[in-house]
Amino acid sequence: KVAFLGDSITDKGVLKDDTHYWAYLDQWLDITPLVYGISGHKWEHIPGQAQKLRNDHGDDFDAIMIFVGTNDYNAALPIGEWFTEEVVTVNADGVMVQRVRRTPVMDHSTFRGSINVVLDGLKRMFPDKQIVMMTPIHRGAASFGEDNVQPTEDHQNGCGEYLDAYIDSIKEASALWSVPVIDLYSLSGIYPMHEEQAIYVPGGTDWLHPNEK
């Protein structure tokens, strides 16, 4: 049993159930997918999805996949810092000395702080479960209404960051929290910035989400 947390690419309601990526994993690997992704969700929403997973299944599952972050970029969430630092007094070889100590930033006001909150919480809530992150894929343009028009990824977002900065932060979190990451940004082969890549997206007003292919 594998839990899938994330956004619209994971959400059951976006594609037919048998054409989601987790449905293909079910077919190929004979897993039981436990799907909690919700369209529009960001890293800050993952704790709520995880709590619902626990309410529904307790510890009766084997792994957690987290596929989220593209909406954080679109929402212009600042990248932020991983740690704060302060000088503390600590015992080192029987001598009290002053050293600089770093503490993870734990709040949802920045991207890195939000990742810290999520991974810290999941490792406490499910200490014996395998946790795997997946980076967002490349982003083409999308228009879902007059007030929801999303430019291509070659534009900076509202806080002056490119999508790459969010991808890099997820990969940094992999090392900081000892959580494997599947770099779909590099490995998926999907590049919806090109019209020739239309075979992989719905097309029209949506070059953001992958299709069943």
Language-model regions: role of each:
Residues 2-6, 32-37, 62-68, 130-135, ...:
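Structural recognition of the beta-strand scaffold that forms the well-ordered cores
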Residues 8-12, 38-43, 69-75, 137-141, ...:
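Solvent-exposed loop/turn segments at secondary-structure junctions
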Residues 29, 125-127, 177:
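Helix C-cap/helix->beta junction micro-motif
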Residues 15-18, 45-112, 139:
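Oxyanion-hole/transition-state-stabilizing segment in secreted/luminal serine hydrolases
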Residues 16-19, 101-113, 157-164, 208-213:
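Soluble non-cytosolic domains of exported or imported proteins
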Residues 50, 115-119, 167:
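Generic structural signal for well-ordered alpha-helices
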Residues 136-213:
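Catalytic His-Asp segment of secreted/periplasmic serine-dependent ester chemistry enzymes
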